[in-house]
C-alpha cells in the first residue's frame, strides 16, 4: 500500500488553546479561505509545506503522551484547512487511536462537499475523531463572503453533517469589531447553534493582531489595519448572546 504523505506547515508541541488539555498541534498546509483576520496566512498556499508521513508525525507527537495523560490532552490537527488532506488525517488519527490518544480537528469546513467519495472518507475519519473545533467566522452569508472571499454554505452544511453524525463539536467564533460583533448576527448565530444538539462548548475568541507581521513578511496588505481588540463589554455581550456559560 502506498504511504500517504501530508503537507505539513509546522507543529506546536505544547498547545493549550486548541482543544482540551495540553496538545500536540499539527498545522497542515493549504486553505481555500482568505480570511481578512487570518493569523496564519503562510498556511494558505496549497502544494507547499513539508511532506511528512503519518507515522513520522505520530512518532514525534507520541513523545509528549505523558503531558496529555496528565492534562486530558491529545493531538489537534489545524491549519490551513486540515480537511483538504483527509487521507493523511485518517492514517494519522488511526495511529493515534490505536495508542489511546484523544484526537481533535480544528476546521471551518470550508472545503466540505457532499461528493460521495469525500463523504465516504469523512465518515471513516469521524470514526477516529473525538472532537471537532468548528470555526464559524460569520453567520451572515454576505458578510462571510466579504470577510473570507468564500461562501459559508459549505460550513453550514458541514455543521449539519456533524449534527447528523452526532459528532461532538465546540463552536468557535472570532469576535472582530465592526466585522463579527453585530448583536443581530450573534443572535442568528446563537439560533443556529441551538439547532445543533451535538455542541458541547461555545467559545468567543477576541480578535488579536499577533499574526499581522506574517502579512507584512509576505508583502500582503493587512486588510484590518487599525482595528483593535474588542472592548471587554463587547466580549461580555457576545458571551451573553451566545450563552457560552451554559456549556461550561
UniProtKB/Swiss-Prot annotation:
InterPro entries: Aldolase_TIM, Organic_radical-activating, Organic_radical_activase, PFL1_activating, Pyruvate_for-lyase_activase, Radical_activat_CS, rSAM. Keywords: 4Fe-4S, Cytoplasm, Iron, Iron-sulfur, Metal-binding, Oxidoreductase, S-adenosyl-L-methionine. Its EC number is 1.97.1.4. Pfam families: Fer4_12, Radical_SAM. It catalyses: glycyl-[formate C-acetyltransferase] + reduced [flavodoxin] + S-adenosyl-L-methionine = glycin-2-yl radical-[formate C-acetyltransferase] + semiquinone [flavodoxin] + 5'-deoxyadenosine + L-methionine + H(+). [4Fe-4S] cluster binds at residues 31, 35, 38. Belongs to the organic radical-activating enzymes family. S-adenosyl-L-methionine binds at residues 37-39, 80, 135-137, 208. Its cofactor is [4Fe-4S] cluster. GO terms for molecular function: 4 iron, 4 sulfur cluster binding; [formate-C-acetyltransferase]-activating enzyme activity; metal ion binding. This is Pyruvate formate-lyase-activating enzyme. One of its GO terms (cellular component) is cytoplasm. Its main location: cytoplasm. Activation of pyruvate formate-lyase under anaerobic conditions by generation of an organic free radical, using S-adenosylmethionine and reduced flavodoxin as cosubstrates to produce 5'-deoxy-adenosine. It is found in: Cytoplasm. Binds 1 [4Fe-4S] cluster. The cluster is coordinated with 3 cysteines and an exchangeable S-adenosyl-L-methionine. It comes from the Bacteria. Residues 17-248 form the Radical SAM core domain.
Amino acid at each position: 500500500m502506498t504511504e500517504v504523505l501530508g503537507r505539513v506547515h509546522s507543529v506546536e508541541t505544547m498547545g493549550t488553546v486548541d482543544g482540551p488539555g495540553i496538545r500536540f498541534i499539527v498545522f497542515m498546509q493549504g486553505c481555500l479561505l482568505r480570511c481578512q483576520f487570518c493569523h496564519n496566512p503562510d498556511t494558505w498556499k496549497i502544494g507547499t509545506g513539508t511532506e511528512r508521513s503519518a507515522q513520522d508525525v505520530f512518532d514525534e507527537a507520541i513523545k509528549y503522551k505523558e503531558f496529555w495523560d496528565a492534562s486530558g490532552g491529545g493531538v489537534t490537527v489545524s491549519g490551513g484547512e486540515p480537511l483538504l488532506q483527509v487521507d493523511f488525517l485518517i492514517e494519522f488519527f488511526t495511529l493515534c487511536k490505536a495508542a489511546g490518544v484523544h484526537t481533535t480537528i480544528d476546521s471551518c469546513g470550508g472545503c466540505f462537499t457532499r461528493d460521495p467519495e469525500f463523504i465516504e472518507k469523512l465518515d471513516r475519519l469521524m470514526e477516529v475523531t473525538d472532537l471537532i473545533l468548528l470555526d464559524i467566522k460569520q453567520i451572515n452569508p454576505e458578510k462571510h463572503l466579504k470577510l473570507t472571499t468564500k461562501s459559508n454554505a459549505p460550513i453550514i452544511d458541514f455543521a449539519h453533517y456533524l449534527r447528523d453524525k452526532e459528532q461532538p463539536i465546540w463552536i468557535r467564533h472570532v469576535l472582530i469589531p465592526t466585522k463579527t460583533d453585530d448583536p443581530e448576527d450573534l443572535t442568528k448565530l446563537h439560533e443556529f447553534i441551538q439547532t445543533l444538539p451535538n455542541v458541547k462548548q461555545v467559545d468567543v475568541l477576541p480578535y488579536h493582531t499577533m499574526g499581522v507581521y506574517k502579512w507584512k513578511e509576505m508583502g500582503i496588505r493587512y486588510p484590518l489595519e487599525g482595528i483593535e481588540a474588542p472592548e471587554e463589554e463587547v466580549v461580555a455581550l457576545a458571551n451573553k448572546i451566545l450563552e457560552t456559560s451554559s456549556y461550561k
